[in-house]
């Protein structure tokens, strides 16, 4: 891939993604797959006058070894230096960049019970820090190719060819063209206009139906709103949390979901794939489910904590999105969630409450935003999906027909 194109991508992440501010610290989480691109990204952050850029390197095979050999006690606690780093996040509010490149099958064979229990025990410690920085900092999730991930998508290609093809797919769907910043400005306007229309309807329910058996009604929060594209932090800084993104999303009312929904794409979760599954909801709670592939892992996800069996997000994405038109199944939620409509199990978003800036997290949760240690998107969009919105006055408005926008 040409360095000039990769440089545009690095500039897009630093400028349009996290919007690095002069004097701000930047934390980058990345795997070992793309050191040259990470170097380029670090330089772009410094060009925007970042105070300090720290790269937190990871390597998926080591994660697998940690879960194999470490005790539950050491997996379930933060050491003093780790807590100090979280406190540093609270004190300095750095922007954070996450570069995804992991092998979708990289954690196959791991002890799922050990992983789930250690995460459950660790969560209360992390949450006390996470809640203090919620909506205060800029963050951006983007992707770079990893060798195993590329071979998963293009198994018939040599590794170098597969990596090049994955780069092309990432850059194309991320709108890295002649002028990526201008392309994202136009894209953000389109998403914001659609959200504005959805919010003008004052919806109280979404009704999903598809020929695959999906028949689900989800209640919405009266004080809620649809969001999409870039957003503004509590510090007043505009940023784009996902590159790419195609969604208009909201957090539903906890306790108000009735019916059944079928997945339409595999879900990559904890380095493994869950596929061909359905979930039945009653009074908002997942009460029955089954997956043909990795049902035990789906069960671990849904039962992770008290909130993981409730919905945290309803996202509207047209089936003819650029990602779906690519014809690729990415085996990566960042991309696959933006291929079609999806729901999320677990944590909801406080910023989907109107005037959330003037409210506490506890107030947002009391209004109906779900709380959980997990937030996992699963795809439900199809070529025949229809979604109707029910307004507060009982009027029904078509939102989606044949898998795409009806307005």
Positions of the model-derived regions?
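Active-site lining segments that contact anionic ligands and/or coordinate catalytic metals
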Residues: 256-258, 274-276, 283, 309-313, ...
């Amino acid at each position: 891939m040409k360095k000039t194109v990769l440089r545009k991508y690095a500039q897009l992440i630093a400028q349009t993604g996290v919007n690095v501010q002069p004097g701000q610290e930047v934390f980058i989480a990345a795997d070992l797959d793309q050191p040259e691109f990470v170097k380029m990204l670090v330089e772009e952050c410094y060009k925007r006058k970042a105070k300090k850029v720290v790269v937190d390197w990871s390597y998926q095979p080591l994660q697998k070894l940690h879960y194999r050999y470490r005790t539950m006690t050491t997996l379930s606690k933060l050491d003093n230096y780790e807590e100090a780093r979280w406190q540093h996040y609270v004190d300095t509010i750095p922007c954070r960049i996450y570069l995804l490149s992991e092998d979708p099958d990289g954690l196959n064979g791991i002890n799922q019970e050990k992983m789930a229990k250690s995460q459950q025990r660790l969560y209360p410690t992390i949450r006390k820090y996470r809640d203090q920085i919620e909506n205060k900092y800029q963050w951006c999730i983007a992707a770079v190719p990893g060798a195993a991930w590329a071979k998963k998508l293009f198994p018939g290609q040599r590794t170098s060819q597969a990596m090049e093809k994955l780069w092309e797919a990432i850059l194309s769907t991320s709108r890295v063209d002649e002028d990526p910043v201008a392309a994202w400005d136009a894209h953000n306007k389109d998403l914001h206009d659609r959200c504005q229309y959805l919010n003008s309807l004052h919806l109280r329910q979404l009704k999903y139906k598809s020929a695959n058996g999906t028949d689900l009604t989800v209640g919405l929060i009266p004080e809620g709103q649809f969001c999409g594209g870039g957003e503004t932090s509590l510090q007043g800084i505009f940023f784009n949390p996902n590159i790419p993104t195609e969604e208009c999303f909201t957090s539903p009312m906890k306790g108000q979901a009735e019916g059944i929904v079928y997945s339409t794409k595999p879900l990559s979760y904890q380095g493994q794939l869950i596929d061909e599954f359905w979930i039945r909801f009653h009074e908002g709670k997942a009460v029955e489910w089954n997956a043909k592939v990795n049902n035990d892992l789906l069960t671990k996800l849904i039962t992770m904590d008290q909130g993981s069996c409730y919905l945290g997000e309803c996202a509207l994405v047209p089936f003819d999105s650029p990602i779906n038109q690519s014809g690729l199944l990415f085996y990566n939620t960042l991309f696959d969630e933006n291929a079609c409509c999806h729901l999320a199990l677990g944590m909801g978003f406080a910023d989907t409450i109107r005037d959330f800036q003037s409210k506490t997290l506890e107030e947002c949760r009391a209004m109906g935003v779900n709380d959980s240690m997990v937030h996992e998107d699963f795809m439900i969009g199809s070529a025949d999906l229809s979604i109707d919105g029910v307004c507060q006055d009982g009027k029904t408005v078509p939102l989606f027909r044949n898998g795409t926008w009806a307005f």
